[in-house]
Amino acid sequence: MEAERPQEEDGEQSLPQDDQGWPPVNATARPWRSAPPSPPPPGTRHTALGPRSGSLLSLQTELLLDLVAEAQSRRLEEQRATFHTPEAPPNLAPAPPRLLEDKEQLYSTILSHQCQRIEAQRSDPPLPPGGQELLELLLRVQGGGRMEEQRSRPPTHTC
């Protein structure tokens, strides 16, 4: 069973149609077409425009939507900007190896200064309440000289 195609009423100007009776679709419009409405069920009253008015309205709606889509497409194309990538001038050669050495030296200088700054900002951890008194008591019991003999040097921080 073949779907009913929209038909034009007599007296209206004819639109060009393809081999299946559909109006042509331009390249910028939608790639799909809406299907014509199904015929009304038997016993339904027709409108004053006749039984084919739904098909004509559907066709007109589709043509209107095609025109709107085409107008919006043209408007977007008019607003599109061109992007030109600048080409590198031929007189600029690749960076010499000296520049790389300078960058490495700068990096190591910054790193060493930051390491020294961090070491300068270090502080001793706070002692718990009564901790200082406990340390003084231990010094008296063990003797000051013995404690100094057992002391080791703290490791040096190298960054």
Curated annotation (Swiss-Prot):
Biased composition (Pro residues): 34-43, 87-97
Cell compartments where the protein resides: Cytoplasm
Keyword DNA damage: no
Main location: cytoplasm
Keywords: Cytoplasm, Phosphoprotein, Repeat
GO biological process: positive regulation of cytokine production involved in inflammatory response; positive regulation of inflammatory response; positive regulation of leukocyte chemotaxis
Protein name per UniProt: G-protein-signaling modulator 3
